[in-house]
């Protein structure tokens, strides 16, 4: 240890040293560690949130300077979280993945009234309709903050949706009073995830705010496209081998029937085909004495039936191939869902 490090250690009070050590232990105890904003959350509500997270995540509050020192001591990339250490913040640790953590924190947020001097988190709109307030000076207060309001049918009505404040603008005292009177709660109170570090990667909220259903559908679509490519390119994999084998079997059978190749697998079809051709030929011979006894009396009308039977045999082979392909496609769809589900399992 250098002299400067010794001096730095010596000037740090013992309680701070112990606090930093505890913070280091906290950071090293979880697979994912993030920084959450806690500004504006009442103490009682914060304690309630911590209880609700018990078992899935833990929240640790401390002085920002000590948190920064702990992040430096852990290193391993955790120091990247220092850029989010500003204002009223806390560390949050979980052994779950960052996506699940973000989803849980967002779901735990609750609507709350906004106070004068606060910044609007989004556009504030007073909706059209009956305010439920009796005629009086409140109609003027509504108009003063930019709402379209008038007295109608013995009540104060907002005649159209009125955007009274844009995102990022400061809330005036007049607007705060109007919103409180109307019971409009334009902000959400909860742990605001600023960033989370997991497995060497730093995630920000906009990267974690994904549509799970859309993401699942994208994965299923990708699996389906990959399966089709594998089948069409005749590139066997564990997932597509059954489809390729069924396809090859069906095509081989069609070739065998067309080329009259003798094989036990399709001998019945060949015999049926030959019989139909023989009967068609016999029907066109006028001298019945030249025919074997079993073929005498075959009428010319049976010719079409014979040709139809031959055509039916070929169509049956094609149908077998199509049925096999449909069965394999159905199996592929089931496999796609399972593969996509497995791919999402670790994230959601």
UniProtKB/Swiss-Prot annotation:
* Keyword rRNA-binding annotated: yes
Single Gene Ontology BP term? ribosomal large subunit assembly
Among InterPro entries, the record links this protein to: Ribosomal_protein_uL10 (IPR050323), Ribosomal_uL10 (IPR001790), Ribosomal_uL10-like_insert (IPR040637), Ribosomal_uL10-like_insert_sf (IPR043164), Ribosomal_uL10-like_sf (IPR043141), Ribosomal_uL10_arc (IPR022909)
* Gene3D superfamilies recorded: 3.30.70.1730, 3.90.105.20, 6.10.140.760
GO cellular component assignments: cytosolic large ribosomal subunit
User: By its UniProt entry, which PANTHER family does this protein fall under?
Assistant: 60S ACIDIC RIBOSOMAL PROTEIN P0 (PTHR45699), LARGE RIBOSOMAL SUBUNIT PROTEIN UL10 (PTHR45699:SF3)
Spell out the protein name for this chain.
Answer: Large ribosomal subunit protein uL10
Biological source species: Haloferax volcanii (strain ATCC 29605 / DSM 3757 / JCM 8879 / NBRC 14742 / NCIMB 2012 / VKM B-1768 / DS2) (Halobacterium volcanii)
